[in-house]
Curated annotation (Swiss-Prot):
Region named Disordered: 1-114, 173-194
Keywords from the named record: Cytoplasm, Dioxygenase, DNA damage, DNA repair, Iron, Metal-binding, Nucleus, Oxidoreductase
InterPro entries registered for this protein in UniProt: Alkb, AlkB-like, AlkB-like_sf, Oxoglu/Fe-dep_dioxygenase_dom
EC code: 1.14.11.51
Name the UniProt record assigns to this protein: DNA N(6)-methyladenine demethylase ALKBH1C
Length: 455
């Protein structure tokens, strides 16, 4: 139970009346002003109307001698006491810190306040800053307690006991521990603790979110109005610049977020040697296991099933493949070379989220079926959010790799003769995501990348 103490100096000038009928002091208020208690109620000074009798004890005279016995003792209710300290002896550190511990008459009564009920006999409230109270519990044991009542500076309130507060803290701590405890998979495997917690690609909204600059929004709208442009990067590799509109990107982000928080959602992938990929991953259609480089229906470490690919995603892919085929055919006529891109129907989508420090080394997408690889069925990649420095080449050598900037809304396709191209992400360019996209979603800083392929 929290408690503060302040001592008065000398006798209070308001106590000047003395009763001749007994050895008890009757407090007389210095003026007619009412005293306002902590709850906003008005408490009248004792001008003969309340006639509350107040006892005093030499033990509480605090060494002032017999010159003036100020009536500084009062009986108070427990419910009216803001800060109570039982016992005359008190730890000096508790006094300095303003925290006192209430000792119960019985050790077994420490768990509850119902065994130590303070019974009020009389109460005296004066305009002074210090009141010393004498309390009596139900067992008849005397207790001396100090009550701080600074009306202008301190608001007195009923406080719960320290024991009940500690119990509440323990209960809350237990609930938080249960929430943060990692869930074991069906086989009892609790490894990859951080991996079992679904990653949220949205930031938690806090406070007021400022709207983006109108000039920036206007520039982005003009860019979107121009439509997309297609470029053949190399035989079998096509870049569709600004292919996905802001509305399309918002829809994709929202669906990925919803899927990512459910079964089979985003997690931290790793390898057998405990090395971790610098990204978060979620598989749709089929699960890809980085430890075995194989596809399956479920994830080995938690047994979750890969969610289905949304129909809207497949529609974007089919249109992008057809557009790429048209561009590749036109380029093939100009170069008089066989630059064909086969058509494909995606049944796998790997969704990766790169943070601002995310990256991915050069690699080949060659874990699909032999038939898919042999036919050169294309891989289609969507980029949303911050821009990425994309690497590609015929060798696993970053120094010899070509560089391409993939911005939000871009679609990259590589198939045919470029199906086995080495590719990766060197870095993410911070704060390059479209402001309009961030205004419509709470996408956290980074890049959301979806790669579609047919097994």
């Amino acid at each position: 139970m929290n408690h503060s103490e302040a001592r008065g100096s000398g006798g209070h000038k308001g106590y000047r009346g003395r009763s001749q009928a007994s050895e008890q002091w009757v407090p007389v208020a210095a003026d007619d002003k009412s005293l306002e208690d902590s709850s906003g109620n008005r408490v009248r000074g004792s001008q003969g109307k309340g006639r509350s009798r107040t006892s005093w004890s030499p033990r509480n005279s605090y060494g002032r001698g017999n010159d003036e016995h100020s009536p500084v003792q009062a009986y108070v209710n427990k419910s009216n006491v803001g800060f109570v300290e039982k016992g005359v002896q008190q730890d000096r550190k508790s006094l300095e810190d303003g925290i006192g511990s209430t000792k119960q008459p019985d050790d077994g009564a420490a768990a509850g306040d119902n065994k130590a009920v303070l019974q009020s006999k009389s109460t005296n409230v004066s305009g002074g800053s210090f009141v010393s109270s004498e309390c009596e519990d139900k067992d008849g044991a005397k207790m001396y307690c100090d009550l701080v009542n600074r009306v202008n500076d301190v608001t007195l309130s009923c406080q719960e006991s320290v024991s009940s507060t500690v119990v509440q803290k323990v209960e809350l701590s237990s609930v938080e521990d249960q929430k943060s405890a990692p869930k074991a998979d069906g086989a009892g495997n609790s490894s990859n603790e951080s991996s079992t917690r679904h990653f949220d690609i949205f930031l938690e909204k806090k406070g007021i979110v400022l709207k983006p600059n109108l000039l920036v929004l206007s520039r982005e709208k003009k860019k979107a109005a121009k439509g997309y442009s297609g470029t053949v990067i190399r035989p079998g590799m096509v870049l569709l610049k600004n292919y996905l509109s802001i509305n399309d990107q918002v829809m994709i982000v929202n669906k990925c977020r919803r899927l990512g928080l459910g079964e089979g959602g985003f997690y931290q992938p790793g390898y057998r040697d405990e090395a971790k990929l610098h990204l978060k991953m979620m598989c749709l259609g089929k699960n890809w296991d980085p430890e075995t480089s194989r596809y399956g229906e479920t994830r080995p470490f938690d047994g979750s099933t890969a969610p289905r690919i949304p129909a809207e995603f497949n529609q974007f892919v089919e249109k992008a493949v057809k557009e790429s085929q048209s561009l590749a055919a036109s380029n093939s006529k100009q170069t008089k070379g066989g630059d064909e891109i086969p058509f494909m129907l995606p049944d796998i989508c790997i969704v990766n989220f790169y943070s601002s420090t995310g990256r991915l080394g050069l690699h080949q997408d060659k874990d699909e079926s032999e038939n898919s690889i042999r036919k050169g069925l294309p891989v289609v990649s969507f980029s949303i959010g911050d821009s990425a420095e994309f690497l590609y080449g015929d060798q696993r050598d970053e120094d010899k790799a070509e560089t391409l900037t993939l911005e939000s809304g871009d679609v990259l396709l590589f198939g045919g003769r470029s199906r086995k191209v080495f590719h990766g992400v060197r870095s993410i360019r911070k704060d390059t995501a479209p402001k309009a996209l961030l205004q419509e979603t709470s996408l956290r800083p980074g890049r959301l990348n979806l790669t579609f392929r047919q097994y």
